[in-house]
Amino acid sequence: MSLTRLNIEAFRNIQFAQLIPAPGINVIYGQNGSGKTSILEAIYFLGMGRSFRSHLSQRVINNDNDKLTLFATLNLARGDSKIGLRRFRSGETEVKIDGEKVKRLSTLAETLPIQVITPESFSLLFEGPKSRRQFIDWGAFHADPQFYGAWTNVRRVLKQRNQLLRNGAVYTHIQFWDQEFVRYAEQVTEIRNHYVDSLNGLLKGIIGEFLPSVDVKVSFTRGWDSKTDFAELLENQYSRDLATGHTVSGPHKADLRLRVGNLPAQDALSRGQLKLLVCALRIAQGKLLKQQIDKHSIYLVDDLPSELDAQHRQLLLKQLTDTGAQVFVTAIDPAAIVDSLHTPPNRMFHVEQGRVTVVE
């Protein structure tokens, strides 16, 4: 799978741009503020309906416009597919796939699986468990068609349960919701656990490429003691949940644990090593997607030279090339990317003040 055409209109400082990307490695270069990261962001927005730069997501629409428009043609195994998205200043989003209106943004994510390696994506290890749950759930969503419905139900029931707790409901009023909560929580947990097991099968070798002298153990924690019956736990923890006004244990507390020896990876590794570990996780996740559903991810790699030294840039780009996936990578100086590739990039684009030109 690859993007064969991308139109960007009124997105950040890009008034209009049309790109004809190539399969393989696409290098996008330009000075800071030129708009090169906005191209990656537009691709992500088209696949997720939101920005990967969360702190800037309210300013995606160009100041002179009342809406942004993104359009892409995808080359899929079954033929070409066309995706279009409009976002209005009101917050309304309109999505079409092959001319048909789409109501759920999850349909976008299913159609256009995207992996991101940016300065922000390193929060996967530097911050709390939320980003690691999202990492697991990205894979579980693509691997198992039952996951989205089960997780949607977990969130629905959890919201209702927490509202009852805040209202001081007696346990008999919560018990009905707990029966549903347990059923969907166990379904979500089983899918997540199976996914992490599958990921582990690939991870060891890939981590070994990036960090050959480090033994990283990866495990999944479900959000409650695996030896404890979840229904009994919810009943036994009712008083505690009532006091806090929310559900203390459950699949919404799950985590992906990465350890080196007896220490969390965050404490045992340097910041540079942690970045390499995140790269390994992203590569493994993309490879597993290809194995499970025979679909490539599209990789978006932002500002690579500032994040990794020359040796590790070369290693990451080799790993990305070996996946066979389409890759978009940005840099201020294109030589920092080109010199790290074993073969010339498939296509290069120069961005200046929001204007994009292909470099022959």
Swiss-Prot record:
Pfam families in alphabetical order: SMC_N
Highest taxon of the lineage: Bacteria
Gene Ontology cellular-component annotations: cytoplasm
Annotated positions binding ATP: G30, Q31, N32, G33, S34, G35, K36, T37
Disulfide bonds, paired cysteine numbers: none
Gene Ontology MF: a single term: single-stranded DNA binding
Protein keywords: ATP-binding, Cytoplasm, DNA damage, DNA repair, DNA replication, DNA-binding, Nucleotide-binding, SOS response
Locations listed in the record: Cytoplasm
GO biological process, one term: double-strand break repair
Family annotation (PANTHER family): DNA REPLICATION AND REPAIR PROTEIN RECF
HAMAP family, A to Z: RecF
Listed NCBIfam families: recf
Function of the molecule: The RecF protein is involved in DNA metabolism; it is required for DNA replication and normal SOS inducibility. RecF binds preferentially to single-stranded, linear DNA. It also seems to bind ATP.
Family of this protein: Belongs to the RecF family.
Name of the featured protein: DNA replication and repair protein RecF
Source organism: Shewanella sp. (strain W3-18-1)
